[in-house]
Amino acid sequence: QMCIRDRAPGLFEQCHHLGEIQQTLINLYDEPEHMKDLIRYLVDYELELAEQLCTHLKPDALFHHDDWGSQVSTFMSPDMFEEFFLDGYKQIYGYYKSHGVELIVHHSDSYAATLVPYMIDMGIDIWQGVMTSNNIPELIKKYGGKISFMGGIDSAKVDYEGWSRDVIAKEVHRACDENGKLYFIPCASIGLAMS
């Protein structure tokens, strides 16, 4: 038996849930110190929650949710992501790992290929929600063994009125044929049907 804890929203989504996504992105440019203060506060909150979860629930794995982009691009440059979010996630995921959590699964159903080095640095074991726009075979070739990729089936291809088992089987076979057997787990990206 394995205990898996899900946690949402993540740091970026918490920022734009407290405000609004467009204003949050503007604030990263116009109010960087205030945004860093907010993110530090959110990290402290996440660490307090992690302490309670690890003390009482003792999860084996964490499924953490924070969308970092659209289908075609991240919401911010890799440099900006590093400046604002990398250290916080290293603290959060580091805490979980040092307190018995064996597996960190991070959900971001988006394009985020440019952030994979940071995912590895912050301790993510599996990126769940990886969309086909990320060139998954290239990511596996470059980063396989350091991180695994779970996705490769864009939800819009299988989650719509009129879907069929044949359509799903075809997409699963396509994903497995394109991405191989190592460091890849076929899975729908999870987003809405239009994503």
Where are these regions (language model features)?
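Active-site loop segments of alpha/beta catalytic cores
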Residues: 1-195
